[in-house]
Amino acid sequence: MPKFLDALAGFAVTLGSMFKKPITEGYPEKPGPVAPRYHGRHQLNRYPDGLEKCIGCELCAWACPADAIYVEGADNTADERYSPGERYGRVYQINYLRCIGCGLCIEACPTRALTMTTEYEMADDNRADLIWGKDKLLAPLQEGMQAPPHDMAPGKTDDDYYLGNVTPITPVPSGTEDAR
């Protein structure tokens, strides 16, 4: 007798869903909401003055189980400074044909240079376009940022950058300079 009741319970679920209004998704015209912690595409972040956070340590590439990240570090010079430390990521590539979106690269990054956004539409009809370089991965320059290479903020050390003690560069409007 209990097996018969189990079958009736299954039919009740089916019968109940037959009379519900069908749910139609509006995707791609109207994409649904994305969870705040969703693992979407990667982004290389910048400091408030525009210098890159990536120091070219390659820890993200070592942590990637799919071998989807390639990093080639280089030394900063007095003439060309891209990050506050001694090194920067000269070449940075993520192969989205291999990436499994696990986020281990994010956890491995010591400077929080690499994060994941909530963007998920990265499809392309060309395989070569799914290998993203620094040009696509770097966060866009915000107001008060200067495109690298440039010197560190006056009076600041690389420790100040890592501790978050750097503010955006604010240009002085023309005509407001002191006439001394």
UniProtKB/Swiss-Prot annotation:
InterPro entries: 4Fe4S_Fe-S-bd, 4Fe4S_Fe_S_CS, NADH_quinone_OxRdtase_chainI. [4Fe-4S] cluster 2 binds at residues 64, 99, 102, 105. GO terms for cellular component: plasma membrane. Binds 2 [4Fe-4S] clusters per subunit. Belongs to the complex I 23 kDa subunit family. It catalyses: a quinone + NADH + 5 H(+)(in) = a quinol + NAD(+) + 4 H(+)(out). Its main location: membrane. Keywords: 4Fe-4S, Cell membrane, Iron, Iron-sulfur, Membrane, Metal-binding, NAD, Quinone, Repeat, Translocase. One of its GO terms (molecular function) is iron ion binding. This is NADH-quinone oxidoreductase subunit I. Its cofactor is [4Fe-4S] cluster. PROSITE patterns: 4FE4S_FER_1, 4FE4S_FER_2. The keyword rRNA processing does not apply. Its EC number is 7.1.1.-. NDH-1 is composed of 14 different subunits. Subunits NuoA, H, J, K, L, M, N constitute the membrane sector of the complex. [4Fe-4S] cluster 1 binds at residues 54, 57, 60, 109. Residues 145-180 are annotated as: Disordered. It comes from the Bacteria.
